[in-house]
Amino acid sequence: MFEKNLLNNKRILVSGGGSGLGKAMATRYLELGADIYICGRRKSVLDETAKELMDLHGGSVKSISCDIKVPEAIEDMVDEIWSEGPLTGLLNNAAGNFISRTEDLSPRAFTAISNIVFNGTFYMTNAIGKRWLNENLKGSIISILTTWVDSSGPYTVPSAMSKAGVNIMTKSLAAEWGHYGIRLNAIAPGPFPTKGAWERLSPGQDTDSNENDSFIPMRRNGEMKELRNLATFLMADGCDYLTGQTIAIDGASHLGSAGNFYQGLNKLSDDDWDGIRNMIKSSNDADKAKRSV
C-alpha cells in the first residue's frame, strides 16, 4: 500500500509504544524507514519491544522511561531525543481507562485517568510543539482518541471527558500552529482488541471474542493493519493540507450504537460490578509489578 521508504528521515516518538496499539503503529513506522522512540513507564517492556522490533525489522528503536504525568520528565526526555536530532512526528497514544459506574469512582480513580489522558497528552504536545516553533520546524502530531468524543462515554466518564478535551486541543492547535507548518490530527478507533484494553474495558472477555459484533455495522472488530495504515497516512508527507481532523475508524459502530459501552453494561448488578472491579484490580496489580522490574 505504501512505498517501502515512505518514512525515511522521519524521527517519531510514540508514547505508550511498548505494547498494544502503540507498539503496532511504531512497528509500521519502523518498517517504512522511520527512526523510532518509544516511551512509557514500564522500562522492561519498552526495552523488550525495542529489541524485538529491531531484531525483526532492523532500523533504530530507542526506549525511554517517562511518566507523561510529570512535565519535568517529559522535558528531560525531549532534551535527550533532541541531542540526537529533532523529532518530525509525535504519536500521543499513552492512555488509561477502565469501566466503572461513575458513582463508584473516587477522586483518585478519576485523576489517575485524567492525569494521563488529558494532562499528559497536553504536556507532550506542548513540549514538542514549542521546540518546533522555536526552531522553525514543521511537524505532525497524531492523538489517539475514541468515537465517544462525538457521542458519549457512559461507564468510562474520566476517559471520555479527557479525550474530548484532547479532541478540542487538536482542533485548536491545528488553527493556532497551522501557519508554522505544524499539523495536528486525531484517530478515533473503534474495537481493536488488545490485551491491556480488554482486561479493563471488557474483563473476562477474550480478545478474539465476537460478542459485540452485533453493535458494529461491519460485524467485526478492526484489524491492526487498518489502524497502522491510517496512522501512517497521517504521519507521512503528501497530505500537508489535512489538519485539525479526528478520523473515526470503527466499522461505523459510532453511527450504529454511539460506539460506547452502554448496551453491554446498563443492566449489570452490584455483584457483577464487584466482580469487574476485582478483575481490573488484578490486571492493574500485574502492571504495577512490571513497572517495578
State each model region's role:
Residues D79, P107, I116-N136, A174-A175, ...:
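Amphipathic alpha-helical dimer-interface segment in Rossmann-like NAD(P)H-dependent oxidoreductases
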Residues A186, D206-L242, I249-G251, I276-V293:
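C-terminal helical subdomain
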Residues E75, N97-T111, K130, N134, ...:
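Conserved mid-core segment of classical short-chain dehydrogenase/reductases
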